[in-house]
Regions:
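C-terminal charged capping/lid subdomain of soluble metabolic enzymes
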Residues: 2-17, 309-452
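ATP/NTP phosphate-donor binding region
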Residues: 2-109
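Solvent-exposed alpha-helices and their adjacent loops that cap or buttress functional pockets
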Residues: 22-23, 47, 102-105, 126, ...
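Generic secondary-structure signature for well-ordered alpha-helical cores
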Residues: 73-77, 101-104, 157, 168, ...
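A short, small-residue-rich loop immediately preceding and capping a beta-strand
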Residues: 103-139
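A glycine/threonine-rich phosphate-anchoring loop and its flanking beta-alpha core
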Residues: 128-226
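Active-site segments that bind and position negatively charged phosphate/pyrophosphate groups
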Residues: 219-370, 375-385
């Protein structure tokens, strides 16, 4: 039996941490249990709201929204609703605009009935409107329920906008357990991605001095451990296992809200996912669930970390390497296409690839290399273990299974780091001149696996 999470330990108060910062979240209520839908009216009233605005899509309304509305009717709570008709919802300007236009100004709180995309849309729109929002979760598919950021696609670029956390997360375990298994395995993939993102965060702390909190890292590790332990029961849709996994996803989100950004839960594995998502959207392809892509990205990043452990560097020679900005810019334009201006603007601002900055990082990398090797060994399970775990649950473990070609794998490894100003393994590989080589290696690795 997995260790139980008591999420109430993190709610309603601030914590002075050994990292020197005060941690707190504005999340007030978490109710993930049997028949939680019947308690939705009570939670709305407890928070002092009179008229919620329910936001769903055709799938989540059928799965949970209609039942939630029925409970509100019985309780005598007036509400308005907006149901997206699109079967594949894209969180872009058009979708956000349609939601803002449909909003009823006599409502005093927004309730997202759904998971990832609906949560991001409601998180951002409520923040812009100066309203609070709640989540009635329909699937344990990702860990962004209570993160402070809203992931949207603007000007063709996947961008995280500062927003706020919901005041409540409600999840009925019967509804959560009945969700398509693909969405459950997506949640597992999102959580397993924490193995690599936490290592990226620690590496950034060692090499760049970026803020790092071991307490928050331990919170995320606890979430990962629970999901791994529950993975055998989750395949059978065991309600207790679904509850544990959903609470682990919420815990990961609380960790993000403590930091104020997604650093404890998003690293190079997410950047690969973002790149594939942007390419799929540009080409008009059906979106792949976020956590499914993250799980595959995690395998790729773990494999690259394993390979990095065996490298030996001539740091003096590395510092002499030049950077062909024109070639980089051409590659960005060729691959990112309509999103390229935003990517180039980010580099002009962040200067991630500035040679003076690179050489300062290389000097620290040389000095800290033994510590970095120890950190890698202590932090990661093997890529083979992760492949077996995901495969046992029926989750994709190879990019080819989700329609990502070898070329797209290679391009993602080379260019995904440009999506964010965030130091990860991909920047280490660029700094050390290994990025193109590792891109080919990972593409070949998955290509061979796909042909077996």
């Amino acid at each position: 039996m997995a260790k139980k999470i008591n999420l109430n330990d993190y709610l309603g108060h601030s914590m002075d941490c050994t990292c020197g910062k005060e941690h707190k979240t504005n999340l007030k209520i978490v109710d993930i249990d049997k028949d939680a839908v019947s308690r939705l009216p009570k939670h709305i009233e407890a928070l002092g709201y009179k008229k919620p605005f329910l936001v769903a899509d055709v799938n989540t309304w059928a799965a949970a929204g209609a039942l939630a509305a029925e409970k509100l009717d019985v309780a005598g709570i007036s509400y308005k609703k907006y149901i997206f008709n699109e079967k594949e919802l894209i969180p872009d300007e058009k979708t956000l605009g349609s939601l803002m236009m449909a909003f009823s100004r006599d409502c005093d709180v927004i309730v997202a009935v759904g998971s990832g995309t609906l949560n991001d849309l409601c998180k951002f729109s409520s923040f812009q409107l100066g309203l609070d929002y709640m989540v009635f979760a329909t699937a344990p598919s990702m860990d962004g329920f209570v993160s402070i950021g809203a992931a949207l696609i603007t000007n063709y670029v996947k961008t995280t906008y500062q927003a706020h956390v919901p005041l409540a997360v409600i999840g009925d375990t019967d509804i959560l357990a009945a969700t398509p298994m693909e969405m459950i395995t997506a949640g597992l993939g999102d959580i397993l991605g924490k193995y690599t993102c936490l290592l990226d965060w620690k590496m950034a702390h060692i090499i760049t001095g970026e803020y790092y909190c071991s307490h928050i890292a331990d919170m995320v590790k606890e979430a990962v451990e629970i999901v791994v332990e529950e993975s055998t029961r989750i395949k059978d849709r065991n309600p207790d296992a679904v509850k544990a996994v959903t609470e682990a996803l919420v815990l990961s989100g609380i960790a993000m809200s403590f930091v104020g950004n997604s650093r404890p839960a998003s690293g190079s594995e997410h950047h690969l996912s973002h790149y594939w998502e942007m390419k799929f959207q540009a080409e008009g392809k059906k979106p792949i669930l976020h956590g499914i892509k993250v799980g595959i990205g995690m395998i790729a990043v773990t494999k690259m970390y394993e390979t990095l452990e065996n490298e030996q560097f001539d740091f003096a020679s590395l510092k002499e390497r030049s950077f062909d900005y024109a070639a980089w810019e051409k590659k960005v334009k060729d691959c990112y296409q309509d999103a390229a201006p935003g990517i180039i603007a980010l580099e002009e601002k962040a200067q991630k690839n500035n040679l003076d900055k690179r050489n300062k990082r290389l000097a620290i990398l040389e000095k800290k290399w033994p510590e970095i090797l120890r950190t890698i060994k202590e932090s990661l399970p093997s890529s083979a273990e992760m492949e077996k775990l995901l495969a046992r649950l029926g989750a994709p473990i190879n990019p080819a299974q989700i329609g990502v070609s070898s070329e797209l794998v290679e391009d993602a490894v080379i260019l995904a780091k440009e999506v964010r100003d965030r130091f990860t393994l991909l920047q280490v590989l660029w700094d050390t001149g290994l990025l193109d080589e590792y891109a080919k290696m990972i593409a070949a690795y998955f290509g061979e696996k796909a042909n077996c």
